[in-house]
């Protein structure tokens, strides 16, 4: 649910006549503990707070978390993974008792007007490369698109609502097609040092520790109407495209 005054994404930058929403800040809390073998550790836990809230206070129940830009390579290959192959790995109740309880994130596909499994974003909150790209133009840059034609201004932001815009949409469908093509076909770099002894040992330990229970090592892409060159490829993305409960220390809403 969007925050009433600030929406669902905080904007720390403004334009002439429109103030930035706020200035996000980080401070760190020292957290101590010990591993199961008794070894002591000290970690720095980041805490997010905000200065210069220009459109009122945040709602008392607001949930906040930080994000960095995701990697852009191989997105079309991830979109070409058959939905059935993703759902086959879901085990939300850990029925097989392996300690892994991945589940798909069901999200709204604006183009199809239906709920589908998400694939993109840090929490699989976008279903397609196109919607992820248009969402970035809209949410990150404030540029309206075919899928998101309305400005992201809240009722509290009259300066934003009154500001001139570049039309509806501000970015054409033709340009978005080119952006989607680029984002979908940007190649994955070739694997490096695969015969190095340390790399082989790391791969062995990765598998032995059970990391591939979540970080699925291999998929075969299905058909791709838009980009047939992506079809039928064996890929190694090391993701299952599912959501996992990482525990209280890593959960951020």
Positions of PLM-derived features:
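Periplasmic c-type cytochrome electron-transfer domains
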Residues: 1-253
């Amino acid at each position: 649910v969007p925050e009433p005054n600030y929406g669902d994404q905080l904007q720390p930058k403004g334009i002439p006549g429109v103030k930035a929403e706020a200035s996000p800040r980080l401070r760190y809390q020292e957290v101590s503990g010990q591993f199961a073998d008794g070894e002591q550790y000290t970690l720095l836990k980041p805490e997010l707070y905000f200065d210069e809230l220009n459109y009122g206070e945040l709602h008392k129940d607001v949930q906040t978390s930080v994000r960095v830009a995701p990697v852009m390579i191989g997105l079309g290959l991830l979109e070409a993974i058959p939905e059935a192959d993703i759902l086959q790995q879901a085990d939300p109740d850990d029925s097989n008792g392996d300690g892994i309880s991945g589940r798909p994130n069901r999200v709204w596909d604006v183009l199809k007007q239906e709920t589908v499994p998400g694939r993109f974003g840090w929490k699989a909150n976008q279903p397609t490369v196109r919607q992820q790209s248009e969402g970035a133009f809209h949410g990150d840059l404030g540029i309206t698109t075919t899928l998101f034609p309305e400005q992201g201004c809240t009722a509290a932001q009259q300066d934003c609502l009154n500001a001139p815009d570049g039309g509806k949409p501000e970015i054409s469908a033709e340009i978005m097609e080119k952006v989607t093509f680029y984002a979908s076909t940007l190649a994955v770099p070739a694997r490096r040092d695969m015969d190095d002894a340390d790399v082989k040992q790391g791969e062995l330990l990765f598998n032995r520790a059970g990391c591939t229970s979540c970080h699925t090592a291999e998929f075969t892409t299905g058909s791709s109407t838009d980009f047939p060159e992506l079809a039928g490829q064996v890929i190694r993305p090391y993701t299952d495209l599912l959501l996992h409960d990482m525990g209280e220390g890593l959960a951020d809403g």
